């Protein structure tokens, strides 16, 4: 059983992923924006992060860069977006994202 942090500003996405992952036996924590994700990461490191790209306060790529610069990128991160670009996927992967899930 893994602890998974779901970071997405859309409540429906957070709820859906939380339900699916919980049903599979995982512990799911949610953050509705980058600041909540920062706060959570400072308290503990999840086993996996599902990170949205487009959020109102700070985008997911910027948050990924912050974690990498602060040596806090110690867990796998899968980037998510319904409005992805190839360039964004490549950038996130170069920073340290494990994978990128989205429609191009």
Identify the residue ranges that each predicted region occupies.
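His-Asp phosphorelay/catalytic-motif detector in bacterial-type signaling
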Residues: 45-47, 71-76
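Active-site beta3 strand of CheY-like receiver
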Residues: 44-50, 55
